Swiss-Prot record:
Binding-site list for Zn(2+): C304, C306, C309, H335
Record's protein name: Queuine tRNA-ribosyltransferase
UniProt keyword tRNA processing present: yes
Catalytic residue list: D91 (proton acceptor), D266 (nucleophile)
GO biological process: queuosine biosynthetic process; tRNA wobble guanine modification; tRNA-guanine transglycosylation
Gene source species: Vibrio parahaemolyticus serotype O3:K6 (strain RIMD 2210633)
Gene name in the database record: tgt
Main function: Catalyzes the base-exchange of a guanine (G) residue with the queuine precursor 7-aminomethyl-7-deazaguanine (PreQ1) at position 34 (anticodon wobble position) in tRNAs with GU(N) anticodons (tRNA-Asp, -Asn, -His and -Tyr). Catalysis occurs through a double-displacement mechanism. The nucleophile active site attacks the C1' of nucleotide 34 to detach the guanine base from the RNA, forming a covalent enzyme-RNA intermediate. The proton acceptor active site deprotonates the incoming PreQ1, allowing a nucleophilic attack on the C1' of the ribose to form the product.
InterPro entries: ArchSynthase1/Queuine_TRR, TGT, TGT-like_sf, tRNA_ribo_trans-like
């Protein structure tokens, strides 16, 4: 079904809302854990839900290569395959193809590349991406686009953005031809160039989508450029549609995104960092492998209500990390995912109570850092 987006409140540029799907509701601003291969690494769906997550992200490109569309359809769709019955957003595969570097060739038609699993020659285009995502049963389908690399000259970024707009129209047309009852999001491109972002927004809104993502950021550009582009782009996006910042990010990035009007985020950071023993806490990051934690009998974060913090000490987690025990990665992941969801809960509460600016000040004070300035403050 078509999602319903209720924008309940604004506090400055920060937005408080709710997404309603047939499979459930999502409170925004929202963070989506990443389940690349149909699993949030190391977690059961019940555990992921227990951290507070209401929507997951799946990866079209990787699920197309393994296990493939036919296996997916044998189960019904991705929800049935992985036993997650809340909403799922799937990316289009564009970023993964971009990440292949020299293994791929981009043309107007689409992208030719070698399958990184077995070396076979393979082709993906806007139409194929729409077909795969329909078979996945994605509640939110992303258009097929080219992620503009950084750095890129103005001319390079312009050509990339213009092709992404043409692919956006093809994605829209094929999505409609397939009679997909779910939702299609456009992706704003244009690199770090404000004039190109303007053209992209205008083109996408003329085509018309159920929501709009800001893509091509967090690809190596300075933070100041990301903030500048967000501040420039978000006010141009339709007020009544959800806004999604793709592939972002650190806790600070989520706060800064909300400050500039973003509603949805995804990133592998909480799960990947957990597996590397980097754990997010109220005051920053704990590297649990460090020797100083060997005899520390306190929990990771006294403010955290996750299963890990309620039951285990830093000393035990340090021991598991040193011994490379699988349980360590699982407990770390539970904690990091819950940290991200608690952060979003705190952000939503602050917006509800008209004290988001105060929340931002407190957030950075706990990290002993200055609040980054708004470019257009």
């Amino acid at each position: 079904m078509k999602l319903k987006f209720d924008l309940k409140k604004k506090n400055g540029n920060a937005r408080r809302g709710q997404l309603t799907f047939e499979r459930g509701t999502v409170q925004t601003p929202a963070f989506m854990p990443v389940g690349t291969y149909g699993t949030v690494k190391g977690m059961t769906p019940e555990e992921v839900k227990g951290t507070g997550a209401e929507i997951l992200l799946g990866n079209t490109f990787h699920l197309w290569l393994r296990p493939g569309q036919e296996v997916m359809k044998m189960h019904g769709d991705l929800h049935d395959f992985m036993n997650w019955h809340g909403p799922i957003l799937t990316d289009s595969g564009g970023f993964q193809v971009f990440s292949l570097g020299k293994m791929r060739t981009i043309t107007e038609k689409g992208v030719h590349f070698r399958n990184p699993v077995n070396g076979d020659k393979i082709f993906m285009d806007a139409e194929k991406s729409m077909e795969i995502q329909k078979d996945l049963g994605s509640d939110i389908v992303m258009i097929f686009d080219e992620c503009t690399p950084y750095p890129a000259t103005h001319n390079e970024a312009k050509k990339s953005m213009e092709m992404s707009l043409r692919w956006a129209q093809r994605s829209r047309d094929h999505f409609d031809k397939l009679e997909n009852p779910n939702n299609l999001f456009g992706i704003v491109q244009g690199g770090v160039y404000e004039d190109l972002r303007d053209v992209s927004v205008k083109g996408l809104t003329e085509i018309g989508f159920d929501g709009y993502a800001v893509g091509g950021l967090a690809v190596g550009e300075p933070k100041e450029d990301m903030h500048r582009i967000l501040e420039h782009t978000c006010p141009q996006l339709p007020e009544d549609k959800p806004r999604y910042l793709m592939g972002v990010g650190k806790p600070e990035d989520l706060v800064e995104g909300v400050r500039r009007g973003i509603d949805m985020f995804d990133c592998v950071m909480p799960t990947r960092n957990a597996r590397n023993g980097h754990l997010f806490v109220t005051g920053g990051v704990i590297k649990i492998r460090n020797a100083k934690h060997k005899t520390d009998t306190t929990p990771l974060d006294p403010h955290c209500d996750c299963y890990t913090c309620q039951n285990y000490s830093k000393s035990y987690l340090h021991h598991l990390e040193r011994c490379n025990e699988i349980l360590g990665a699982r407990l770390n992941t539970i904690h990091n995912l819950r940290y991200y969801q608690r952060l979003m809960e705190s952000i939503r509460k602050a917006i509800d109570e008209d004290r988001f600016d105060e929340f931002v000040q407190e957030f950075y004070a706990r990290r002993d850092r200055e609040v980054p300035p708004l470019s257009k403050a």
